[in-house]
Amino acid sequence: MKLDAKSTIETGKAILGIEFGSTRIKAVLIDQENKPIAQGSHTWENQLVDGLWTYSIDAIWNGLQDCYSDLRSNVKELYGIEIETLAAIGISAMMHGYMAFNKEQEILVPFRTWRNTNTCLLYTSPSPR
């Protein structure tokens, strides 16, 4: 039996997707047929820190919280309900970026993004002989 969007959310069958893009963090709820039923977003901008383009860990967490809050507001506006349970969550992040953590889950270096070109010197410099 196919559920309508409101019932999908109410019964905890909605799936949350989050994407950390280079200019926005986006969240979307989809139904069991992969149809978008609600969305939220947060605009952000990376910063040049010590010669590297990055996002602070605080910006990451604050952006995620704001994006999810925007999604919750969208659900409330469209369906008059709150999100209580989800069937699944998927998270993706911008291509060519990474975050390194230790076993205590502490960040080891600032978030490196696709905008960093510092390693290109390895490919443009003459090889040692």
Q: Where do the protein language model's features map onto the residues?
A:
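Carbohydrate-associated surface elements
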Residues: 116
